[in-house]
Amino acid sequence: MKGFKSLVVMTLTLFLVFSFMGNCNSAPQRLFERRNWTPQAMLYLKGAQGRRFLSDQSRRKDLSDRPPLERRSPNSQQLTLPEAAAVLLAFLQKPQEAGDENLDQTRFLEDSLLNW
């Protein structure tokens, strides 16, 4: 009985050691190292990793190089509440009017997709 217990303990211990060794390879090794990457390697990394490969310094530089955002309209006067409501109502009524004209086209598309 004592030999059987030691055999089971030894087997479980070996199983744990081998499973731990298998998981060590999939763990991240360390943070990204700075290297002199070629432009082609940078494009590959950007495609594979997204923008994560960029260093913090280049991120800050990218943000500082950008021009300041501008308003769409040079008119800085804000709309009053009734004016904004009128613009919103006009915007919401346009798709309904256009939707009535395109109603036959959507039926045609649905029929053609069903018969496809």
UniProtKB/Swiss-Prot annotation:
Cellular component terms (Gene Ontology): cytoplasm; dense core granule; extracellular space; transport vesicle
Region feature Disordered, mapped onto this chain: 53-80
Bias (Basic and acidic residues) ranges: 53-73
Pro-sequence residue ranges: 27-35, 50-116, 74-116
Annotated keywords: Amidation, Cleavage on pair of basic residues, Cytoplasmic vesicle, Hormone, Secreted, Signal
Position of the signal peptide: 1-26
InterPro entries: Spexin
Subcellular location: Secreted; Secreted, Extracellular space; Cytoplasmic vesicle, Secretory vesicle
Keyword DNA-binding among UniProt keywords: no
PTM-bearing positions, type Glutamine amide: Q49
Keyword Zinc (UniProt): no
GO MF, one example: neuropeptide hormone activity
Superkingdom of origin organism: Eukaryota
GO biological process, one term: negative regulation of heart rate
Sites annotated Cleavage: R35, N36, R52, F53, R72, S73
PANTHER family in UniProt: SPEXIN
Family statement drawn from the similarity comment of this UniProt entry: Belongs to the spexin family.
Stated role: Plays a role as a central modulator of cardiovascular and renal function and nociception. Also plays a role in energy metabolism and storage. Inhibits adrenocortical cell proliferation with minor stimulation on corticosteroid release.
UniProt name for this protein: Spexin
